[in-house]
């Protein structure tokens, strides 16, 4: 799982 997408999800 990429952390970049995770960051956008927890914006």
From Swiss-Prot:
Parts forming coiled coils: none
Compartment annotation: Cytoplasm
Any one cellular-component term (Gene Ontology): cytoplasm
GO molecular function list: GTP binding; translation elongation factor activity
Source organism, top-level taxon: Bacteria
Expression triggers: By salt stress.
Keywords carried by this UniProt record: Cytoplasm, Elongation factor, GTP-binding, Nucleotide-binding, Protein biosynthesis, Stress response
Described function: Catalyzes the GTP-dependent ribosomal translocation step during translation elongation. During this step, the ribosome changes from the pre-translocational (PRE) to the post-translocational (POST) state as the newly formed A-site-bound peptidyl-tRNA and P-site-bound deacylated tRNA move to the P and E sites, respectively. Catalyzes the coordinated movement of the two tRNA molecules, the mRNA and conformational changes in the ribosome.
Family: Belongs to the GTP-binding elongation factor family. EF-G/EF-2 subfamily.
Protein name: Elongation factor G
Organism: Bacillus cereus
Lineage, top ranks: Bacteria, Bacillati, Bacillota, Bacilli, Bacillales
């Amino acid at each position: 799982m990429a952390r970049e997408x995770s960051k956008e999800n927890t914006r």
